[in-house]
Amino acid sequence: MDSLTQKLTVLIAVLELLVALLRLIDLLK
């Protein structure tokens, strides 16, 4: 796996985590 693919995978994982956090915060409001 080249570094670009690895960076994209990490970026997508981080974005999914952020979305999950935003949904949690929205539910807690």
Curated annotation (Swiss-Prot):
Membrane topology for this entry? Single-pass membrane protein
Give the CC-aspect GO terms.
membrane
UniProt keywords, alphabetically: Membrane, Transmembrane, Transmembrane helix
UniProt induction comment: Expressed during exponential growth in rich medium and at lower levels in exponential and stationary phase in minimal medium (zorO mRNA cannot be distinguished from zorP mRNA by these assays as they are practically identical).
Would I find Transport among this entry's keywords?
A: no
The keyword Transferase is assigned to this record = no
Give the source's domain of life in one word. Bacteria
State its role.
Toxic component of a type I toxin-antitoxin (TA) system. Overexpression leads to cell stasis and a decrease in colony-forming units. Probably repressed by cognate small RNA orzP. Base pairing occurs between 18 bases in the 5' UTR of zorP mRNA and the 5' end of OrzP sRNA.
Q: What's this protein's name?
A: Small toxic protein ZorP
